[in-house]
């Protein structure tokens, strides 16, 4: 059950509207929540739970695909209200349990408004692990680094529904990832999974059928397009500074000037390390 959560990020030109998806999986005994949205998202999530005829207290397990604010922001309030266990990849644990550290190391505009506070990760999960849902169903953990070092995707079997977190960039949207090579490798790994029926991404509306693989192809092409633009501009402007490079790349790939924010600067820096 997808839950679309709108929020805004401050910018010099005013608030920028964004959204993120969380997902509920209902089992007979309890509810599993994938990602917690931003601070305050618990109200929307709990409302969706009640609309399903269930109670928020039935959320027994929260799986975090990674540690960024729009995925962990509501986790503290959700855990306080439900007592749920929280699972994440070991590489994401530090920033989930120490949000002040995350703010220092990865400053995001409006961070303190987006994140309710830290939470303790009670279960560490990695590539190949399985989260049992009951009735023969399970979530297979797939390590998909790139967006962040510990990003995970989840494949629900036997339905073959893929929850990809932020592993699949959206063409025309802000390119946000820490390692372009790892992002490409993760995308290719997901693209090689056969018979995916539905794709539930945090950044885009749910997709089914052939659209699943078209979406992955498009994300793959977007990372390649950013890489092309970085290479083109660094060759044309040897010794160019990072901020100036980012502004030129943003223009080259067709994004507005305000897209050259700290998160995108971080992405472009990663591409220069690749070069």
Label each PLM-derived region with a short phrase.
Residues 100, 173-178, 214:
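Short, solvent-exposed loop/turn segments at secondary-structure boundaries
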Residues 81, 182-240:
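Divalent-metal (often Zn2+) His-rich catalytic cores of metallo-beta-lactamase-fold enzymes
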Residues 39-41, 67-72, 93-96, 149-151, ...:
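Active-site environment of divalent metal-dependent phosphoester hydrolases
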Residues 40-43, 50-134:
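Active-site HxH/HxHxD metal-binding segment of metal-dependent hydrolases
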Residues 34-36, 59-67, 86-90, 143-146, ...:
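Active-site neighborhood of phospho(di)ester-bond hydrolases with catalytic His/Asp-centered motifs
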Residues 1-52, 56, 153-166:
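Conserved beta-strand hairpin/beta-sheet module of binuclear metal-dependent hydrolase folds
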């Amino acid at each position: 059950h997808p839950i679309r959560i709108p929020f805004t990020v401050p910018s010099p030109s005013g608030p920028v509207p964004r959204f993120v998806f969380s997902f509920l999986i209902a089992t007979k005994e309890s509810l599993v929540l994938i990602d917690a949205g931003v601070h305050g998202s618990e109200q929307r999530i709990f409302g969706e739970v009640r609309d399903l005829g269930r109670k928020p207290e039935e959320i027994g397990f929260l799986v975090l695909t990674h540690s960024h604010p729009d995925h962990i922001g509501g986790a503290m309030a959700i855990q306080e209200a439900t007592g749920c266990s929280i699972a994440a990849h070991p590489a994401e644990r530090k920033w989930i349990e120490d949000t002040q550290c995350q703010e220092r190391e990865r400053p995001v505009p409006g961070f303190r408004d987006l994140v309710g506070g830290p939470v303790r990760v009670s279960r560490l999960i990695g590539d190949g692990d399985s989260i049992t849902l009951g009735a023969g169903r399970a979530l297979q953990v797939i390590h998909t680094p790139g967006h962040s070092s510990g990003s995970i995707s989840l494949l629900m079997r036997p339905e073959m529904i893929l929850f990809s977190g932020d592993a699949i960039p959206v063409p025309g949207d802000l390119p946000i990832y820490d390692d372009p090579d790892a992002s490409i490798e993760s995308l290719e790994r997901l693209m090689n999974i056969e018979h995916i029926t539905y794709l539930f991404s945090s950044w885009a509306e749910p997709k089914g059928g052939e659209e699943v693989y078209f979406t992955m192809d498009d994300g793959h092409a977007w990372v390649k397009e950013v890489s092309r633009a970085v290479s083109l501009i660094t060759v044309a402007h040897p010794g160019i500074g990072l901020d100036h490079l980012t502004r030129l790349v943003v223009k080259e790939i067709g994004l507005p000037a305000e897209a050259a924010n700290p998160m995108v600067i971080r992405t472009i820096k990663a591409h220069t390390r690749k070069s």
